[in-house]
From Swiss-Prot:
It comes from the Eukaryota. It is found in: Nucleus. Belongs to the CPSF1 family. This is Probable cleavage and polyadenylation specificity factor subunit 1. It comes from Caenorhabditis elegans.
Length: 1454
């Protein structure tokens, strides 16, 4: 058996976050970096996101959101990160990342290509540094010096690697020193940081020279130590400069404090300690659990009654530290300083806000805090400083005996103005005390669906009756996951294929395309134009669709395109021969086109209309208001376009035109960019306004820091500095000065309001609305793409051989143009000299058709259309490019470039090749050159703003989301779509109208607003607020069984007295943090409202854990089928070491009852059929052939359910602890906590159960989840483990390595860098494949897909593979590393091989699993690289594309 593994959706959890200048460019501002397992994202803070009027407000408002600017996926998990400025890139921040086991990569964003480039690679892995260990390594830690002098990496916990950043060095040379060489006691490193304010880079280690445990705390405590080590990076010398011993034994984390305070904070589970080399230490204790276990002097804050284990912290400013606890609370730790402000006297600790359970905290721009979470949604918070005054409880006695002479002293006006009534204010200050507090509010949140603990499939919700098809072979379902933890616990409902809610549907024969045009005052559409083969149908939109009786539009011929001008006030219709302009119920103008050839394509963007005729002629019209409103033709023959197009190399047929209105301010001329300091303004007025705004911000900031009196006395310091050194006209210098000042102020009280302090380059749409520029994109038959300015029609950008789809598009230089012209002339001469036969001519025509750009558009996507995306259709594929600012040496041309996005959208469902191996004809219909556009941009559909719908055989929605950039979602549940238009109506707000291909049905629909389409997998998240352990769908009653728990503090201990267990209550003081074992409950959730069904809750006993929850089909005589589906649960009573562990098996059925009034979902009740305590812990359940298979610790029992009782049939002794069972007919796989996996066989005739085979590898890692891989008559077994491996086994008794069948043979092993806890098996998808007969469909369906979800929120699948496809893809996987460089320099084999890496006898064939994440990089290569790589493999490129697309579509599901 061969397999194919691919991760389809990126992780949503966030492990690391950092703030810095990661995007190149002078005016790009600062960004937030997040890394979740393998997914890197870079965000900017955008304060200009428009929020539509709601119930609270009547006007549009602007809110702040995080906007993804860049994203990419690594091959393996990142363990630690740091941010530094390296000498190679002094103007931007670089990212240092560590990987298994001791690898370090330094990466940054490349300015020219806007991709992740690798600056330096360091591998510290060798046998000597390992000291003989092969696993259980300490993860590599990387830290950077605050002054950017060097970085340090902890290697295997025993060595330190130093990376000096020498200014004049071209490369970064590292060296490794053993920690024992620095100091013999330096061992068991818990954490390390660089200290700020030292002359040389100084590393502070937190370590434990002699370890202790909680069990030995009464004998040995206060074992933690710190050591400050100064690093001389020139001489490679180390010197110990600071040591402190006898710190509390629970210390685990260090937080460096920047100067002027300096020093570091040490966080423990119960304590916080501040250490400084020049100041005596001070600390505080947070509970009474530590009484008697430390002699360190600590301030008593035991009344807080909390712990800081698993906490995270970050330094904010002015002696404030934010601390996030494991319960999801945000605390403020203040360093109280002496009157001089230089030394810390004490610590204050208080709760300030409730957040998600934080895993990382990062201070962004002043006043902004990012909370990264692995267990819940990540949040962007804004905080402001509030100062309140209160009277002191004790007032000083006032002095009565005042000197009468002193009162008579007269003060002149200057003294009064300068010093005021100082004495009176002094006395008032004594009577009042100022309290400072931080006020937080949430600005934005990044949704997280991880960690996925359990997963099941359920009935499709939100499924319209029009989409229900009885003949459909493929099932439609929802994927429901149990996500989050604690108060972040949630149910997530996922829909792979978009399912629009159909409002109405009607048959419309002969219709080809449709457009909704014209706007009423409430922004709803007036008309629906439907183009037919030889005519046009006009429908008026109101309460119903009614055919328009008035002759406003042209109905006697088919419509080519329709749109709106003047912001929707004018409706435009373009037919084959004329243009109609309609407004307010009357036709304003009808323009007859002066051409002998019909119009085949049109583009309508306010205020221009561009037309393309069948002979390739371009016509341009502009809407003018003088002397009256009309469309006026622009004389193209008088522009430079005519002379440019007439030249020899440009004299080719035009194949596509489109107009783009740029609101992003990216499309600027390169020459103008240089003269204006990096394109910082747009025009002089805007630049001046920006400078004024920045000066105002800095003035407000200075008032916060110094006060208004300083300005009055000494003048405005900001203005003086800027006037002396930086001219106001120079936008670049002003921005640079602003950034410099803000970075210096981070250590002080520089908290700003949300507007203007984001350090972001986001554009304000209210400011740029008047400066929108228009451009014409023209594609030529020879594969060239050109951009022209409107209305001048000047050539401002050219892309040569666009049909080659390179990874980077740049402007065509004069030299390249001349070279292309000579090559074309040689090719023409060669073709003229050699006569061609008919077959070769057909082949040439097909090749030209494959290279032709059939459609090319630039679409403004994302927030405020700030992300221009170039979309083009080449060779029946949609390619996507993102535009970014870049330098351009050609004067008068645009300073932009395009980078290819890793998305592959294929527009055909059949294979590219015929049975004879030749290119199959195009599926896209082109009649006489006329073809309707497939790319349909829209401003808003439901909750999606500025998206694109691509129609055709595989309809696809494209969303450029703020969450993670470009996402693609297929909408194949209604089959192919031939027409689409956005539609707004009073009854259907922001809906859609589309037309199906097969039945020609017109559907008015809306997308479900509850779902988040910016996620890689559209999801609806239902917050439950409890930890969800199991979720199972019960099909017969259409409800979900959900097992959840909440922690419940307990002071009870159970002991055995006279063979009976008894409770002992241990009284603790009120400041003791009691253990909180989970209290489990079972609820039924209805999919109607996604809330718990009333009166169905089952509570379990204290200390009883639900370990298994399954729906099982058991033999029954009361049903026709002979099987009855029940809900089975297994529990464990764990009362401690003395009490014998027991468990229960509970069998329930869900019955239907009469619902209670006003509670429609209360029509279900749980009826318990069987509930009995067992002699051991019940740890796993499943049904096998109508019987109940039950894991009880190290045994497996099989039961028969009869007469509401369980009768034992057979049992089997296993290894240590069986915790998961999966069955298929009469076989089952059992996962053991320590001994991997076993295959169990049950022989019903003999009532015998036996171990057929098992995984006996000594190096097998502790397993997490298992599932079957089914390929028709063949079965394989999947196993995921704690190190992120996925292993595939076979039962092959005839193979010599299987030892006669006793050993499961390892077919494949791969490490995906994330832990998998949930599998679901689905049958193969056939709807997207062109299959000829039923046998082929059945074979595909029986080749089942195993879908997995990880603890990081990512999804993927494993599929069986035919040997022919495997061999082709295996060769591709071997060679692709030589063509595509991997991010961070990760080697494909090294980073994806199973961990720990060691040769095993049973792993000879561990290469039989194709890594889909690697081989699918082939789809994103240029045409030249694809062809070259395919030639090296001995096949055509279409063979590989067909294989990969077939695998994608078989693994897709509704």
């Amino acid at each position: 058996m061969y397999g194919y593994l691919r991760e389809t959706d990126d992780s949503t959890a966030i492990n690391f976050s950092a703030y810095g200048k990661f995007l190149p460019g002078e005016n790009t501002g600062f960004q937030l970096l997040t890394i979740g397992a393998k997914f890197i994202r870079i965000f900017r803070v955008n304060p200009y996101v428009l929020k539509e009027p709601g119930e609270d407000n009547e006007e549009w408002q602007q809110k702040t959101k995080l906007e993804c600017m860049f994203s990419c996926r690594l091959l393996n998990k990142c363990h630690s990160i740091a941010v530094a400025r390296v000498p190679q890139l002094p103007d931007q921040d670089s990212i240092l990342m560590t990987f298994d086991d001791a690898k370090l990569s330094i990466v940054s964003i490349n300015e020219k290509e806007r991709n992740m480039q690798t600056i330096s690679l360091h591998a510290f892995e060798n046998e000597y540094l390992r000291d003989g260990f092969i696993n259980h390594f300490q993860p590599p830690l990387v830290r950077s010096d605050p002054s950017n002098r060097c970085a340090a990496c902890l290697v295997y916990g025993k060595h330190i690697a130093i990376l000096p950043f020498h200014e004049n060095s071209k490369r970064i040379h590292s060296y490794v020193i053993p920690l024992k060489q620095i100091d013999p006691r330096l061992d068991n490193i818990a954490d390390m940081v660089f200290l700020d304010g030292y002359y040389e880079p100084t590393i502070l280690f937190l370590y434990e020279p002699i370890q202790t445990t909680p069990g030995r705390a009464c004998v040995r405590y206060d074992t933690m130590c710190i050591m400050g080590v100064s690093v001389n990076i020139v001489d490679r010398q180390f010197a110990v400069v600071w040591q402190t011993a006898n710190l509390p034994m629970d210390c685990s984390q260090l937080l460096p404090i920047p100067k002027p305070l300096g020093g570091a904070l040490v966080f423990g589970s119960n304590t916080v300690v501040y250490l400084n080399q020049a100041v005596p230490p001070c600390g505080l204790v947070l509970n009474s659990c530590y009484d008697g276990f430390t002699k360190f002097p600590l301030k008593d804050l035991k009344h807080l009654k909390m712990t800081l284990d698993c906490s995270t912290s970050v330094y904010m400013e002015d002696g404030r530290i934010a601390v996030g606890s494991r319960d999801g609370d945000l605390f403020l730790l203040r360093l109280m300083t002496s009157s001089g402000g230089g030394t810390v006297k004490s610590l204050e600790f208080s709760k300030v806000y409730e957040t998600s359970i934080a895993y990382s905290l990062t201070v962004c721009a002043p006043g902004h805090l990012f909370v990264g979470s692995r267990l819940g949604d990540s949040q962007l918070l804004e905080y402001t400083l509030l100062k309140t005054t209160r009277d002191c409880a004790v007032k000083r006695l006032k002095i009565d005996n005042k000197d009468p002479a002193a009162a008579e002293i007269e003060l002149d006006e200057d003294d009064m103005e300068l010093y005021g009534g100082a004495i009176e204010e002094q006395q008032n200050d004594d009577d009042e005390q100022i309290d400072e507090s931080l006020q937080f509010r949430e600005l934005d949140r990044l949704r997280n669906v991880g960690p996925v603990k359990s997963m099941c499939v359920g009935r499709p919700n939100y499924m319209s009756n029009d989409l229900v098809d009885a003949k459909r072979r493929d099932p439609v379902f929802d994927l429901v996951t149990a996500s989050g933890h604690g108060k972040n616990g949630a149910l997530c409902v996922h829909q792979r294929s978009l399912r629009p809610e159909i409002i109405t549907s009607s048959l419309l024969e002969g219709a080809e395309q449709l457009w909704a045009v014209g706007r009423k005052e409430n922004e709803s559409h007036k008309y629906l134009i439907v183009s037919r083969v030889r005519s046009t149908l006009i429908l008026e939109l109101g309460e119903e669709l009614v055919e328009l009786e008035e002759q406003l539009f042209v109905t006697g011929e088919p419509t080519v395109a329709a749109g709106e001008l003047s912001q929707g006030a004018l409706a435009v219709q373009v037919t084959s021969t004329c243009i109609a302009l309609v407004t307010d119920g009357q036709q304003m103008q009808e323009v007859h086109i002066d051409s002998n050839f019909p119009v085949i394509q049109a583009s309508i963007v306010d205020p221009y209309v561009a037309l393309l005729t069948q002979n390739g002629r371009l016509l341009l019209y502009e809407l003018v208001m003088e002397p009256y409103v009309q469309l006026r033709e622009v004389d193209i023959s008088a522009t430079s376009f005519a002379t440019w197009h007439a030249t020899a190399q440009n004299l080719t047929q035009l194949t596509s035109i489109s107009i783009y209105a740029d609101a992003s301010e990216i499309m600027k001329f390169a020459a103008a960019e240089k003269s204006m300091g990096g394109g910082g303004g747009g025009d002089g007025e805007v630049s001046t306004a920006e400078n004024a705004m920045m000066k105002k911000e800095q003035h407000e900031e200075a008032i916060l820091l110094h006060g208004e009196d300083d300005d009055f006395l000494y003048g405005d310091e900001d203005e003086t500095i800027m006037e002396q050194n930086f001219p106001v006209e120079n936008g670049e210098a002003t921005i640079k000065q602003s950034n410099t000042r803000k970075r210096k102020r981070l250590g002080h009280d520089a908290i700003q309001s949300s507007r203007g302090g984001e350090q972001s380059d986001a554009i304000d749409p209210t400011r740029t609305f008047s400066s929108i520029s228009h451009w014409l994109i023209v594609s030529h038959e020879n594969g060239r793409l050109s951009i022209h300015s409107l209305p001048e029609m000047e050539v401002v950008y050219q892309i040569g051989r666009f049909s080659n789809v390179p990874e980077l598009l740049v402007d065509l230089t004069v030299e390249e143009e001349e070279k292309e012209r000579k090559a074309k002339a040689q090719q023409a001469a060669k073709e003229a000299s050699v006569p061609t036969d008919e077959a070769e001519q057909l082949n040439t025509e097909m090749k030209q058709l494959c290279e032709r750009v059939l459609e090319a558009q630039i679409v403004g996507m994302g927030i405020n259309q700030a992300h221009p995306i170039l979309m083009a259709i080449v060779d029946e594929q949609v390619v996507l490019y993102e535009m970014f600012s870049s330098s351009n040496p050609i004067p008068g041309h645009l300073g932009i470039s395009f980078r290819k996005l890793p998305h592959f959208i294929c527009l055909r469902t059949s294979s590219h090749l015929n049975s004879d191996g030749k290119r199959a004809p195009f599926e896209m219909k082109i009649n006489n050159g006329k073809r309707f556009s497939l790319i349909h941009p829209f401003e808003r559909v439901s909750s999606v703003n500025n998206g694109v719908m691509i129609v055709g055989a595989v309809p696809t929605l494209l969303v450029y989301g703020a969450w993670g950039g470009m996402q693609t979602h297929q909408m194949t549940v209604d089959g192919p779509i031939k027409a689409f238009t956005p539609f707004n109506n009073e009854n259907v707000l922001h809906g859609i109208v589309y037309m199906t291909q097969h039945k020609s049905e017109l559907r008015i629909a809306r997308m479900h607003p509850d779902f988040d389409y910016e996620m890689p997998y559209p999801v609806k998240k239902i917050e439950v607020g409890r930890t969800i352990h199991h979720v199972r769908y019960l099909m017969n009653s259409d409800v979900y069984a959900v097992v959840s728990s909440i922690p419940k503090p307990s002071n009870k201990i159970w002991v055995v007295m006279n063979d009976d267990k008894q409770e002992e209550i241990h009284e603790k003081d009120e400041n003791f943090v009691l253990p909180a074992p989970p209290k489990y409950t079972l609820n039924l959730f209805s999919s109607q409202d996604w809330a718990a069904v009333p009166n169905t809750e089952i509570s379990f006993e204290d200390m009883e854990a639900v370990t298994a929850c399954e729906d099982v089909a058991l033999k029954s005589e009361s049903t026709i089928s002979g099987l009855e589906t029940l809900l089975a649960m297994g529990t464990v009573n764990n009362y401690g070491e003395e009490v014998l562990v027991r468990g229960r098996i509970i069998l329930c059925e869900v019955i239907e009852v009469v619902p209670e009034p006003d509670q429609p979902t209360s029509n279900r009740k749980i009826k318990v059929l069987f509930d009995k305590e067992q002699k051991g812990p019940v740890t796993g359940l499943c049904a096998i052939n109508g019987l109940l298979l039950c894991g009880m610790g190290q045994k497996v029992f099989i039961w028969q359910f009869k007469d509401n009782d369980l009768m034992g049939i057979s049992f089997l002794d296993m290894h240590y602890y069986v915790y998961q069972l999966h069955s298929l007919r009469t076989i089952a796989i059992a996962c053991d906590a320590r001994e991997s996996m076993s295959l169990i066989r049950f022989q019903e005739d003999n009532k015998a159960m036996s171990i057929a085979s098992r995984d006996d590898r000594k190096c097998a890692q502790p397993p997490m989840a298992s599932q079957l891989v089914v390929d028709g008559a063949h079965v394989g077994f999947l196993l995921s483990d704690e190190t992120g491996n996925i292993t595939m086994f076979n039962y092959a008794p005839e193979a010599p390595e299987s030892n006669g069948g006793e050993r499961l043979t390892v077919r494949a092993a791969i490490n995906i860098g994330t832990n998998i806890n949930a599998f679901v098996r689905l049958r193969g998808h056939t709807s997207l494949l062109q299959l000829n007969n039923e046998d082929e469909k059945e074979a595909i369906e029986q080749r089942m897909t195993t879908v997995f979800a990880s603890l990081d929120g990512s999804f993927g699948f494993v599929r069986p593979l035919t040997e022919k496809s495997y061999r082709r893809l295996h060769f591709l996987q071997t060679f692709i590393g030589s063509v595509t460089p991997q991010i961070a320099g990760l080697h494909i084999k090294g980073s994806r091989s199973a961990k720990p890496s060691q040769p095993i006898v049973n792993g000879r064939n561990a290469r039989n699993l194709i890594d889909g994440d690697v081989v699918e990089q082939y789809l994103h290569l240029s045409l030249y690289d694809k062809t070259d790589l395919a030639r090296r493999l001995g096949v055509g490129r279409y063979h590989i594309i067909d294989d990969l697309m077939q695998l994608r579509r078989m693994a897709f599901y509704y």
